[in-house]
């Protein structure tokens, strides 16, 4: 099985978690990172492309199997819409958008395009939630 080529948008706290997971998974390959901070480029392994904005990514010539959006919440809708327009599966970190209307528009677009659209709910796997569940059961 070939590895999935992932583009990561945003290299803040959550983006760094996604980056670590992508790089440690034998089934995924981090092909590029989009972040406006040039300092973040220094954190990338050799061979991982750096883009300072989404418009710099050559989607026509890059092999991108999926995109993870971990940028600022206010940018999620615009980025998600562009990625879905390209028929590329996308995971958008929570909160997906600043309002439910934009989320519904993204959901509708994903259905029309028959493309995967998911919310990143990684924190539900945080061990603290298991601990809280145990407390509630006592």
Please describe what each predicted stretch is.
Residues 28, 65, 88, 115-116:
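Short, well-ordered coil/turn segments that N-cap beta-strands
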Residues 22-23, 57, 136:
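Hydrophobic C-terminal alpha-helix "anchor/cap" residues
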Residues 1-47:
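N-terminal Rossmann-like dinucleotide-binding module
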Residues 7-9, 91, 118:
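Conserved hydrophobic packing residues within short motifs/helices of P-loop NTPase cores
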Residues 97-138:
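A contiguous active-site-proximal alpha/beta segment in oxidoreductase catalytic domains
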Residues 18, 49-109:
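Beta-loop-alpha module in the N-terminal Rossmann-like domain of NAD(P)-dependent dehydrogenases
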């Amino acid at each position: 099985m070939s590895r999935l080529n992932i583009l990561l948008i945003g290299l803040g706290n959550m983006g760094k978690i996604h980056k670590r997971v992508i790089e440690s998974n034998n089934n995924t390959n981090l092909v590029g990172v989009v972040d406006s901070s040039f300092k973040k480029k220094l954190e990338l392994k050799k061979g991982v492309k750096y883009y300072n904005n989404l418009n710099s990514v050559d989607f026509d010539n890059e092999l991108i199997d999926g995109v993870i959006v971990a940028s600022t919440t206010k940018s999620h809708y615009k980025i998600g819409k562009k990625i879905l327009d390209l028929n590329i599966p996308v995971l958008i970190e929570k909160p997906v958008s600043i309002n439910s209307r934009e989320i519904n528009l993204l959901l509708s677009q994903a259905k029309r395009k028959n493309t995967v659209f998911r919310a990143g709910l990684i924190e539900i796997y945080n061990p603290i939630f298991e601990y809280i569940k145990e407390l509630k059961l006592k």
